[in-house]
């Protein structure tokens, strides 16, 4: 079973603490994307044996030959469906409700992060609602705190 670790910046010590089954996802919406930084993280993850995904930019993930991309819940775009990607390219998405789940299915993601299970924010689902929603799709689900 894979684990997922979201990062906002490159900090080797955080990646070093992860095992090889942990997929690293770079997600920082507060700054412009620095391709050089992305390549640095990619190369470090490769050296450590971790897969590396970037958030909300499938085109760049393909261009930089990353392991995949993560599509956040607010992204409804389906342009990437026309892109040619290798078979092992991973596309993950996140959702908070049935509408967003259906959008992620139409975006043809490999798995859906469903959040949040615990009462931390306005998108709180709880365990029972998580179970109910996860029965509505054949896609694999990943519970987010």
Positions of the model-derived regions?
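Conserved N-terminal beta1-alpha1 strand-loop-helix module at the mouth
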Residues: 1-78, 83-110, 138-139
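Broad hydrophobic/π-residue packing in well-ordered secondary structure
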Residues: 37, 68, 111, 118, ...
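Glycine-rich phosphate-binding active-site loops on the catalytic face of alpha/beta enzymes
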Residues: 72-81, 113-126, 144
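Short flexible/disordered coil segments
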Residues: 87-91, 114-119, 133
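Glycine-rich adenosine-cofactor-binding loop
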Residues: 94-95, 126-145
